[in-house]
Amino acid sequence: MWITQEITPYLRKEYTIEAKLLDVRSEHNILEIFKSKDFGEIAMLNCQLLFKNFLHIESELLAHMGGCTKKELKEVLIVDGFDLELAHQLFKYDTRIDFVQADEKILDSFISFFPHFHEVKNNKNFTHAKQLLDLDIKKYDLILCLQEPDIHKIDGLKRMLKEDGVFISVAKHPLLEHVSMQNALKNLGDFFPITIPFVAPLRILSNKGYIYASFKTHPLKDLMTPKIEALKSVRYYNEDIHRAAFALPKNLQEVFKDNIKS
């Protein structure tokens, strides 16, 4: 049996699977989990694939991209996603996490897929809310948006950031869909003086790119190496990975020269 991942409208990958382990459907989402010989379990969420053996790559990169460029990480907001492993990584800092996800049925169906599901959900500093309006009014050090936000969402979320806060959002991969990345950079650039694209180096199974945005904090100039060296139980993230994430080939430097703000 095979499952197909759509990388772009014109590019697809196929993966061999052995069996389907789970099929859960809600009003807005479809989650299927498969058993794979090469990749362990594979979750397909609305045609996007998550590989259980490689969950740590994105969660470590995004968590510590924010955590190691900020002196303090006291308040974190995660919206538009299901990745509880991201929260697990963020708990390496002395932080409180607000996690906004309305689809409890799908979130709870990841119970056996996310290795630290119970640990995160039971943490006293973790709050799960169905919508932003359910949360106390506060300012955040770090906001992570796990789907590409439109300008209205950007406008709302940036008002929730502290003056030196960091906003990280998912975008299209800059190499595969550079026009979409350009548009995402332009949208964020209308609200932030610092907007820089990055990817996960050596991650070959993803079609995602990301954008680091901030009013004051710079992902390279403000990187704190001692914080990186103090991290424990990480398998992917280090200083080299952090810096390499922002490297662009010459042709993309030219493509994005009017969109990157640093």
From Swiss-Prot:
So where's the catalytic machinery, residue-wise?
A: D155
Pathway per its UniProt entry is: Amine and polyamine biosynthesis; spermidine biosynthesis; spermidine from putrescine: step 1/1
Show the InterPro entries listed in the entry. PABS, SAM-dependent_MTases_sf, Spermi_synthase, Spermidine_synt_N, Spermidine_synt_N_sf
Q: Where in the cell is it found?
A: Cytoplasm
Tell me a Gene Ontology molecular-function term this record carries: spermidine synthase activity
Q: Where is the PABS domain?
A: 1-249
Give residues annotated as binding S-methyl-5'-thioadenosine.
N29
Entry function? Catalyzes the irreversible transfer of a propylamine group from the amino donor S-adenosylmethioninamine (decarboxy-AdoMet) to putrescine (1,4-diaminobutane) to yield spermidine.
Q: Which HAMAP family match?
A: Spermidine_synth
Q: Could you tell me which NCBIfam families the record lists for this protein?
A: PRK00536.1
Family that this chain belongs to: Belongs to the spermidine/spermine synthase family.
Name-wise, this protein is Polyamine aminopropyltransferase
* Organism field: Helicobacter pylori (strain P12)
Q: What is the lineage of its organism?
A: Bacteria, Pseudomonadati, Campylobacterota, Epsilonproteobacteria, Campylobacterales
